[in-house]
Structure formats: C-alpha cells, structure tokens
C-alpha cells in the first residue's frame, strides 16, 4: 500500500564484458565481489553472475565519469544551493553495453569544515515510487534535527529508475488516473468483484503498452545496483545510506548484494524481507496492522471528544465513520468523494500521528454540517496536471516493482478467499489494498524470485529503527531484518505507530541515529524508547 495511492489511481495497477570488467575494476572502484550470484538455491545462478558483472562495469564507468553538477532546472523546484545531475546506468545489468538510462540525482554539500566531512549520505523515502530529491532540502530548510549530520555529510537524493526524472514509466493517462469517484473498494456482489478484476487486468495491460520495455527491469535488485553505481559516481568507496519504508527493503537488498560496500546504514520502518512476505503476504499483513492503528486513532479521537464531538468511545467514532462511508457510497460528496476517496484521505491517520488532529478536525466539520472541508481535502485536483502526472508515475512504479519483484497468486480464488476472510475483522483497508495490487495477478512480464536477504562478508553493524505499532510496515519486519543482519541494532519506539520515525520528535531515537551516523557506534544492546508525546487537538 502506497500512501495516497487509492485516491490517485484510475483503476481500482558475455565474454567481452568479462574482460572489460577486469580492466575497469582495476581502476577507480573495487570489484563488488559480494554481489556475485547469491548461493540461495533458487535458480538465480548465471543471471545473477551476469548482472553482478554488469553492475561492476557500470560502477567502474560511473567512477571514471563522475557527475556533472549544475543548478537544478526550474521545474524541479529545488532551491539553491542544491545542485542536480545525472548518473547513467544500464537498463538491463545483464547487458551493460546495451540500452542506458539516466538517473536524476541531487546534492547539497556538508555544512561543516572539510575535515568534518565524512562523505555522502544517500536517501530513499520509500514507495516503491517515491522520489528522494527533496532530501537535500532538509539542509536548506535548516532542520535542527539534521544539523549535526549535515555538518559531516553531503545530503544526496535520487529518483530511482522509472521515477520522476529517471526514465519515468506510466500505466495510464494521468488525468484519467485521478478521475473520481472510484468504485467502492468493498464489493457488494460478485459483479462488483468482476468489475474490479477487469480494471486490474486493464491496468496491467496499460503498463505493458506504455512502459513494456522497462517493466522486466523494474526490480529492487536493479535499483540496488543503481544505488551502487551512484555511490561510485559520487566518488565514494563506501555507501552511507538512510532508507525509510520500502527504502529499508532496498537497503536490505543492497546490503546483501554489496555487504563490503556499506559504511553506515540506517533503515527506518522496515519492510519484512522474508521471501515468504515479498510481496503478497506483506500486503495482507498491512491490512491487519492498519486496522490496529485505525483503532488507536479512534481511541484518541474519543478521548478528545470535547474538541471533536465524534463520540467518547471508539465504537461511537466508528459508527460516525460507517455513517459517513454509507452516505458517500449512496451519493458521493460533492459528486467526487466516494468510499475510495474517503479511505485514501483517512489512511493518513494510521500512517502518521501528525495527521491525527487535522483528520479529526475535518471529520468533525463534516459531522457538524460542513461537507465542503472534506471534499476539498479528499477530492482530486484535475487542474494540477504536474501533480497528477507525478501521482500516476508513482503508482506505476509501485505496481511495476512489486509485481516484478516476486511471484503473486495468479488464481483469483486465492485472492478472494484471503481478502474475504481478512475483511471480516480488518475492514478498513483490506479490499482497497487488494484491488491496488491485483494487477500483479495478470502481470505481463516474468516475475522474479526475491533475494534471500542475509549477512555477507564485510557488512558492518546496521541500525534499525521502528515504531511498535507501525501500520504500513508492521513491527515484525524489523525483528526479521535484525535477525538476518548479524551485528545490527534495533531501536524500538514502544507504544507508538508513526511510519518513519527518524528526524521526528523523539530524542531517544534521534540522538542515537546521530551518534551512529557520526561515529559508527551503536548501543551494546537493543534499545526500547518510550513513545513520543501523543498529539494535542
């Protein structure tokens, strides 16, 4: 489940090389020997060998070329002194001399002295489909939380392959993508299910028609290889990395493929890296976690009934939600906000407790008779063509990566059985999430076997950060990665649930992230932090 994706979608989707490798690797960049074929017994074998050689060729080439930094284009909306550039990578790492694509990158230099500089810190915000180009703005915005880290590191962002300015892909016309209202995600009949299945199939077909050449190469391992090429282009021998949400899985895959290329790695709000979870089961697990965090928000709203007047028990708040949902299903608010748009708007509350008060306030206004506030918040803006194109692109990348990364059930009966059962006790998100991912059931290109994430030779301690009640990436994912990456440390924010907790308001977490990035030191044992304060109305 990508944040705000429901609201934004239109459907409810050789030999010569080896010789050159040896020559290039002897120069500017060390051979990523750890990225050779993982001994996982799942048939990657020769293809992984070819892609490992291709990644080495591309990294060596990038190290020689560097990056031509210049002022960012005006339509990138990045303030000076942030600089922008491109890094060239193979579309297919098995064919490193074949078609090339350009990846957009940006940076801002460290704010400290030359002697304080430790290198570049590269960021991925998640998705898949999220752009990291806003990361350097944490320096221009003078964020106090990042001030110490900014003294030591250049802040570097990038658009992953397929995203934004990096060979963007598309699955449907953006203006069609944002039209509303969408069909109610909760099916009322078998006919409703057939209609949603048709939309999902058409979306998958649209991805192939509009972006078919890129689809087979839209995988997390390829993005990890891209990340290593960016590292080399920056002139960095080792990677310093901060990944949030899906960015944690990207980091886990990178750490498995290139363990001896990691210097520091912070992963925050962790995707469960188990092959059994990527990606079908992971989305079912999300539905359970979202229901729990939805209830947390309802409890908070009830505790603040004096401010919101939505009921002083969770049951009363839920009753108001069901009434709103039923009204929108019967007659979309403002003609454009139905149940799908409501879920897209209200899902901000389970994602981030910073959204608790704004979401409750708009809900309260609706119950008090002000429908327009909710329409303004939940309806798409058809005049925002740039924003709509970005939203469509983000959803296309999400679908392409998750559908290509792993095998999904092709039998509709499996989807119907699992989601019908789950919906009974976890109704908030289940069917909406199912329809979003259903294009993977009819995906038109080969689906891969996920990498076996594990500790390789040279991997340093990785810092894992996780809130205990995170909805989008349930806590068990952090525990799983902690077990797989030997020597890692886990920081848990107890009884909290915000998704992405580094750089927020808990000094118990922020101070430890700072210490790790600046010194490499971690606590001798895993740490449990008290929760940050709950929001005020």
UniProtKB/Swiss-Prot annotation:
<dbReference type="InterPro" id="IPR013595">
    <property type="entry name" value="Pept_S33_TAP-like_C"/>
</dbReference>
<feature type="active site" description="Nucleophile">
    <location>
        <position position="245"/>
    </location>
</feature>
<keyword id="KW-0964">Secreted</keyword>
<keyword id="KW-0645">Protease</keyword>
<keyword id="KW-0732">Signal</keyword>
<keyword id="KW-0378">Hydrolase</keyword>
<dbReference type="GO" id="GO:0006508">
    <property type="term" value="P:proteolysis"/>
</dbReference>
<dbReference type="InterPro" id="IPR051601">
    <property type="entry name" value="Serine_prot/Carboxylest_S33"/>
</dbReference>
<dbReference type="GO" id="GO:0045148">
    <property type="term" value="F:tripeptide aminopeptidase activity"/>
</dbReference>
<comment type="similarity">
    <text>Belongs to the peptidase S33 family.</text>
</comment>
<feature type="signal peptide">
    <location>
        <begin position="1"/>
        <end position="36"/>
    </location>
</feature>
<comment type="function">
    <text>Cleaves tripeptides from the N-termini of proteins. Does not cleave mono- or dipeptides, or N-terminally blocked peptides.</text>
</comment>
<dbReference type="GO" id="GO:0005576">
    <property type="term" value="C:extracellular region"/>
</dbReference>
<feature type="active site">
    <location>
        <position position="470"/>
    </location>
</feature>
<dbReference type="Pfam" id="PF08386">
    <property type="entry name" value="Abhydrolase_4"/>
</dbReference>
<feature type="propeptide">
    <location>
        <begin position="37"/>
        <end position="39"/>
    </location>
</feature>
<feature type="domain" description="AB hydrolase-1">
    <location>
        <begin position="119"/>
        <end position="497"/>
    </location>
</feature>
<keyword id="KW-0031">Aminopeptidase</keyword>
<dbReference type="InterPro" id="IPR029058">
    <property type="entry name" value="AB_hydrolase_fold"/>
</dbReference>
<feature type="active site" description="Proton donor">
    <location>
        <position position="499"/>
    </location>
</feature>
<protein>
    <recommendedName>
        <fullName>Tripeptidyl aminopeptidase</fullName>
        <ecNumber>3.4.14.-</ecNumber>
    </recommendedName>
</protein>
């Amino acid at each position: 489940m990508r944040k705000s994706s429901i609201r934004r979608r239109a459907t409810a989707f050789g030999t010569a090389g080896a010789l050159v490798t040896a020559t290039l690797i002897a120069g500017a960049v060390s051979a990523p020997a750890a990225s050779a074929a993982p001994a996982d017994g799942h048939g990657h074998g020769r293809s992984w060998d070819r892609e490992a050689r291709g990644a080495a060729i591309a990294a060596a080439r990038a190290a020689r070329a560097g990056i031509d930094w210049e002022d960012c284009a005006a339509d990138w909306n990045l303030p000076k002194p942030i600089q922008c550039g491109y890094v060239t990578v193979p579309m297919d790492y098995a064919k490193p001399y074949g078609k090339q694509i350009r990846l957009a990158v940006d940076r801002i230099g460290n704010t400290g002295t030359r002697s304080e500089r430790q290198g570049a810190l590269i960021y991925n915000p998640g998705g898949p489909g999220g752009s990291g180009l806003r990361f350097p703005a944490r320096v221009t915005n003078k964020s106090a939380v990042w001030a110490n880290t900014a003294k030591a590191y250049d802040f570097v962002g990038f658009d992953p392959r397929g995203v934004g300015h990096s060979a963007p892909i598309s699955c449907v016309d953006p203006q069609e993508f944002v039209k509303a209202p969408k069909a109610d995600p909760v099916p009322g009949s078998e006919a409703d299910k057939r209609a949603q299945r048709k939309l999902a199939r058409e979306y998958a077909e649209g991805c192939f028609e509009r972006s078919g050449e890129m689809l087979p190469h839209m995988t997390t391992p390829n993005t990890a290889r891209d990340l290593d090429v960016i590292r080399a282009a920056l002139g960095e021998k080792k990677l310093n990395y901060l990944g949030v949400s899906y960015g944690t899985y990207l980091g886990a895959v990178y750490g498995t493929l290139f363990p001896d290329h990691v210097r520091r790695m912070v992963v925050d709000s962790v995707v469960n890296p188990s092959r059994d979870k990527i990606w079908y089961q992971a989305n079912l697990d999300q539905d359970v976690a979202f229901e729990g965090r939805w209830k947390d928000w309802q409890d908070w709203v009830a505790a603040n009934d004096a401010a919101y007047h939505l009921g002083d028990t969770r049951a009363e708040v839920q009753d108001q939600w069901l009434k709103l949902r039923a009204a929108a299903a019967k007659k979309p608010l403002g003609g454009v906000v139905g149940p799908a748009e409501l879920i897209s708007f209200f899902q901000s509350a389970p994602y981030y407790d910073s959204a608790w008060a704004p979401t409750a306030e708009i809900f309260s206004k609706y119950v008090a008779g002000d429908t327009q506030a909710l329409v303004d918040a939940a309806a798409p803006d058809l005049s925002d063509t740039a924003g709509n194109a970005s939203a469509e692109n983000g959803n296309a990348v999400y679908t392409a990566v998750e559908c290509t990364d792993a095998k999904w059930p092709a039998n509709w009966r499996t989807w119907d059985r699992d989601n019908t059962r789950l919906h009974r006790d976890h109704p908030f998100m289940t069917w909406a999430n199912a329809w979003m991912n259903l294009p993977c059931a009819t995906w038109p290109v080969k689906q891969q076997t996920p990498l076996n994430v594990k500790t390789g030779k040279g991997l340093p301690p990785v810092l894992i950060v996780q809130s205990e009640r995170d909805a989008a990436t349930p806590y068990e994912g952090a525990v799983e990665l902690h077990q797989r990456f030997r020597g890692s440390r886990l920081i848990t924010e107890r009884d909290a649930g915000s998704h992405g907790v580094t750089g927020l308001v808990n000094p118990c977490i922020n101070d430890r992230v700072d210490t790790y990035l600046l010194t490499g030191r971690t606590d001798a044992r895993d740490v449990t932090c008290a929760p940050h304060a709950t929001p005020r109305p």
